[in-house]
Amino acid sequence: MSETFEKRQLYGGAIEIDIPRRFIDVTSYRHIPDHQELFSDEKSDQSVIIELNEFQDHISNANAIKHHYEVLVEDAGISTDKSVILNFRELTQAEMPNFDASIPKYVLLAQQKIAKFNETAENTINIYMALVRLEKSKTDLLITFNEAIALAPTSSSVAVVQNLTPSNDQSKSEQLFLTMLKSFKIKDYSLFVHN
């Protein structure tokens, strides 16, 4: 079954991205920080997060994506033995064609064991993270796709997730993420004006 994508307007229309239609805008029912946009699909336990973060000028381009991932892990309170970076690489111009080739772009795949909300049951999650370094705009732009690949039997996700296949087709998930990245476009750079 192929995905049906829908163009989503972010940050008041300043950015657009194609996201699968099955994902809903979480801001319609939950408060999300102003620097983030969040979409989720409860039935697959997948989510997409777009974040505008301060440019980390003290970190090299090659290490910046690892830095942002480590901040995510630390903020979530995940111990280092429950999180691993599987690989990371530079994105090609063809993978993010709406950005000049001179703009540094990276992608990372990691895996975490993490409990939802206040639960103790830990699910195994694949994290696909992309970083676009907008030095002139003083912004590190993150796009993250989270996908549960194994659910603990007592996790609250078990009751709502449909058809989670333990074998997990990682290449299909990676292709889904790359399709989103290919569509990602900044339409109005005044979004990044700092006072």
Curated annotation (Swiss-Prot):
Classification via SUPFAM superfamilies: Mog1p/PsbP-like (SSF55724)
Q: Which domain of life is it from?
A: Eukaryota
Is Zinc tagged as a keyword? Answer: no
What Pfam families does the annotation carry? Mog1
Q: What residues form the membrane-spanning segments?
A: none
Choose one Gene Ontology CC annotation of this protein and give it.
nucleus
Task: Return one Gene Ontology term, BP aspect.
Answer: protein transport
The alphabetized UniProt keywords are:
Guanine-nucleotide releasing factor, Protein transport, Transport
The record's GO molecular-function terms, alphabetically, read:
guanyl-nucleotide exchange factor activity; small GTPase binding
InterPro entries noted in UniProt? Mog1, Mog1/PsbP_a/b/a-sand
What biological function has been recorded for the protein in this entry?
May regulate the intracellular trafficking of ran.
Q: To which protein family does this belong?
A: Belongs to the MOG1 family.
**Protein's name in the database:** Probable ran guanine nucleotide release factor
Taxonomic source organism: Dictyostelium discoideum
Output the lineage of the source organism. Eukaryota, Amoebozoa, Evosea, Eumycetozoa, Dictyostelia
